[in-house]
From Swiss-Prot:
GO molecular function, one term: RNA binding
Reaction catalysed by this enzyme: L-glutamate + ATP = L-glutamyl 5-phosphate + ADP
Annotated metabolic or biological route of this protein: Amino-acid biosynthesis; L-proline biosynthesis; L-glutamate 5-semialdehyde from L-glutamate: step 1/2
Function: Catalyzes the transfer of a phosphate group to glutamate to form L-glutamate 5-phosphate.
Protein name: Glutamate 5-kinase
InterPro entries per record: AceGlu_kinase-like_sf, Asp/Glu/Uridylate_kinase, G5K_ProB, Glu/AcGlu_kinase, Glu_5kinase, Glu_5kinase/COase_Synthase, Glutamate_5-kinase_CS, PUA
Species this chain originates from: Alcanivorax borkumensis (strain ATCC 700651 / DSM 11573 / NCIMB 13689 / SK2)
Annotated residues for binding of ATP: K10, T169, D170
Length: 376
């Protein structure tokens, strides 16, 4: 193991609460003890912690989870106090401090705020503080929601350039079939995060997909973009942390590709909300994938959605498969007017020309083939 590593550890509500009814402080103490042991081995730790809503419900005396978004946000606000206090109290027993970091997708979609969040987290780690990260449920809306803490943890792993993302769950890892209905199901010990077959296994219907394994595999793909190894493992015992540090292999390990994206493209790839879609002809797809070119308007056959200059759009081929995503140089109305046109014709059509490309290659991230694009 390298002299110093950095791990992002995502712990779900089921591993921190008493059946969803408030925090299990004794169990949290065990988690903290094991994370302190990791630090003593030279492993920096960032925690992505669930449990705020469950703790808030207990403090408010609610026996049933509310349906109202505002009530859930209120519970999260109340519970976040208890969650942070619980982590801080237990780390202080080891003379360590924690820091609360609440994020929304907007924080990571804006380049300046992204860099500020990164600088803050790295500064905290430099001071020996343990960051405790969660989504800012009190103010978040559907438009800026990460959707789940697995995705948030992956983006944090990219943000701090973690060596490992550890997603702890109530399952042993990813199986090649549903182990609850198939006694012959085998645990997948290791795979490439970019392997499309892994996504199909995790989300190809049945209980595995509904149980959230698909989101964990997608998080592994996202974390792999910065070179992080992802391990999906059972968190029923906090000893899993020590086992992994000892080089043992519980769970499923998703390996990154050999060349991680540079910092800017990591940020671009972290945009989960696309403001629109550009449909590319076959020639444009080949030029992007094989030649590393910018996207010119002549290669765009259709434009969907409403977006402004500088916003993130998805690029897809004519079969609807993801090619990439990037920051567009023209708004939706202008993009529709210049699609299928040569760059030399832009000024004549619009009366001006911002750039000769619809998306410059420096602002474009290519995706592996076989990924469907959701409608914009």
């Amino acid at each position: 193991m390298a002299d110093r590593q950095r791990w992002v550890i995502k712990i779900g509500s089921a591993l921190l609460t008493n059946d969803g009814k408030g925090l299990d402080c004794a169990l949290m103490q065990t988690w903290v003890d094991r994370m302190v042991a990791l630090r003593e081995r030279g492993i920096e730790v960032v925690i992505v912690s669930s449990g705020a809503v469950a703790e808030g419900m207990t403090r408010l005396g609610w026996s049933a989870r509310p349906d109202s978004v505002h009530e859930l946000q209120a519970a999260a606000a109340v519970g976040q106090m208890g969650l942070v206090q619980a982590w801080e109290t237990r780390f202080q027993q080891h003379q360590l401090h924690t820091a609360q970091v609440l994020l929304t997708h907007d924080d990571l979609s804006d380049r300046k705020r992204y860099l500020n969040a990164r600088s803050t987290l790295l500064t905290l780690l430099g001071f020996g503080v343990v960051p405790v990260v969660n989504e800012n449920d009190t103010v978040v809306t559907d438009e800026i929601r990460f959707g789940d803490n697995d995705t948030l943890a992956a983006l944090v792993a990219n943000l701090v350039e973690a060596d490992r993302l550890l997603i702890l769950t109530d399952q042993e890892g990813l199986f090649d079939a549903d182990p609850r209905s198939n006694a012959d199901a085998n645990l997948i010990r290791e795979a490439r995060a970019s392997d499309p077959a892994i996504v199909r296994v995790a989300g190809g219907g049945g209980l595995l997909g509904r149980g959230g394994m698909a989101t964990k595999v997608r998080a592994g793909k996202l974390a792999a973009r910065s070179g992080a190894i992802t391990t999906i493992a059972s968190g029923r015992s906090p000893e899993v942390l020590i086992e992994l540090a000892d080089g043992q292999g519980p769970g499923t390990t998703l390996l990154p590709d050999t060349t991680p994206m540079n910092a800017r493209k990591q940020w671009l790839a972290g945009h989960l909300q696309m403001r629109g879609r550009l449909v590319l002809d076959a020639g444009a797809v080949v030029r992007l994938r094989e030649g590393g070119s910018s996207l010119l308007p002549v290669g765009v056959v259709d434009v969907f959605g409403q977006f402004s200059r500088g916003e993130m759009v998805a690029c897809e081929d004519e079969r609807g498969e993801r090619v990439g995503c990037g920051l567009v140089n023209y708004d939706a109305a202008d993009a529709r007017r210049i699609c299928r046109k040569k760059s030399a014709e832009i000024a004549g059509v619009l009366g001006f020309m911002n750039e000769e490309e619809l998306i410059h290659r420096d602002n474009l991230v290519l995706m592996e083939a076989g990924s469907r694009v959701s409608g914009a």
